[in-house]
């Protein structure tokens, strides 16, 4: 079941990469049709996963370590529980609806493929944000969302207002980045770990000691 949910997480990334090749092979209409209908698969997998984890069973999936520096170790891992899978399902439904609406609204736009690819990448980083099992991976998802927000807002880059709005969003996100990084440093300073499972256990222990 964890493997199916892991596939769900990476479907938008596959869409982001493959849509360009699909357009070359079969044309824009077929490429967009395939990408849009992939969200039906995402919703189905999300419903199956939610049914499996609704009993309160936590599922962890670790692909390996990607940062090792002394005691600072960050794993490329995912946690699938009721909360994260519910968020996966909700994001998948909303993103699918946005994809379908965008395809209809921008049907005549020559850059529709590029817009859909940005949407797919945005969805992928949303999935990373809600399923990551540590604060660094959460930060990666947050940064990716900020980048994709800028790309989507400035999509029509010939419009002055679109560029201004994109720049404003980028600046505001950087303020959030600073607060996020400060919190991340403090978490590692006090708990010597950035893994959610370790931090949550130790934080509850500190609370009991304090009381």
Range-by-range predicted roles:
Residues 1-211:
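...captures the hydrophobic TM-helix bundle architecture rather than a specific catalytic motif
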